Design a protein with these regions (language model features):
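Terminal helix-turn-helix DNA-binding modules in bacterial transcription factors
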Residues: 173-212, 234-243
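C-terminal output helix
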Residues: 91-100, 112
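Receiver (REC) domain active-site loop signature in two-component systems and cognate sites
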Residues: 40
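Acidic, metal-coordinating helix/loop segments flanking the phosphotransfer/catalytic sites
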Residues: 15-33, 197
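Two-component/phosphorelay signaling modules centered on CheY-like receiver
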Residues: 1-14, 169, 174
Length: 243
């Protein structure tokens, strides 16, 4: 209750009395971060943490574990189970707030870094291995169907064997964007790779990545990468010649 009162003015907060109740909420609601007490009835914080980290749809969520146990063994256990941060009680409210802000901001910064670059590689610490594999699979499906009229959120849900709401919840939590926005991002990042190769004209890249209008392609590309397609080509040609 103390944390709920101190966070609800800044964030949307969902509370649970124990780990089992929290897990039920997590399976139905999109959550950006979890703060859990280690000691709870029915299912304690460690068990909740383990279930979250072993669930493909939840494992991306940052997890803060609070505990009255001030021992190295307990801290190691929390980190081994996958906690992002282990905080001992009594804690400083300011420290908890700063930790929450930092974890959420780091997630935003990581995806912005990924989205603003042409390639599909992630920085090593941007996300966990399971999340990278999940996103790689989704990205592969989009790239295989870029020129297909059937490319849609429905196609992704079918190929990923997920409900529409589950796909939305996982992707939004992992990247901050909706499935439709991610499809557009993959189109543009693929376009940037093709343009950088120097093997295709802008018009060819436009249609190879599923855009039906050159002007719309140029507008979307400029918004995503901060330069027009022709300037992007020129910059990469200059880089190759100077290298």
């Amino acid at each position: 209750e103390f944390l709920v009162k101190n966070f609800e003015d800044t964030y949307g907060v969902l509370s649970a009395k124990n780990g089992a109740e929290a897990l039920a909420i997590l399976e139905q609601q999109a959550c950006d971060l979890i703060i859990s007490d280690a000691l709870m009835p029915e299912m304690d914080g460690f068990d909740l943490l383990m279930k979250v980290r072993n669930d493909e749809m939840l494992c991306h969520i940052p997890f803060i574990l609070l505990s009255v146990v001030d021992s190295v063994a307990s801290k190691i256990k929390g980190l081994e189970y996958g906690a992002d941060v282990y905080i001992e009680k009594p804690f400083s409210l300011g420290y908890v707030k700063a930790t929450v802000e930092s974890l959420l901001e780091n997630r935003k910064r990581a995806f912005h870094h990924f989205a603003s670059r042409p390639g599909f590689q992630y920085e090593k610490d941007d996300m966990g291995r399971n999340d990278r594999q999940w996103l790689d699979k989704l990205t592969g499906i989009v790239r295989e169907n870029l020129t297909c009229e059937t490319l849609s959120v429905d196609l992704l849900t079918e190929k990923m064997a997920l409900s529409r709401s589950s796909l939305q919840r996982k992707l939004k939590g992992l990247t901050g964007v909706s499935p439709n926005e991610y499809i557009q991002l993959v189109r543009l990042k693929t376009a940037a790779q093709l343009l950088r190769s120097g093997e295709y004209r802008i018009s060819e890249v436009c249609y190879q990545t599923g855009f039906s209008s050159m002007s719309w392609f140029a507008k979307c590309f400029t918004k995503q990468f901060g330069m027009r397609p022709k300037d992007f080509i020129r910059q990469n040609q200059d880089g190759k010649s100077s290298g």
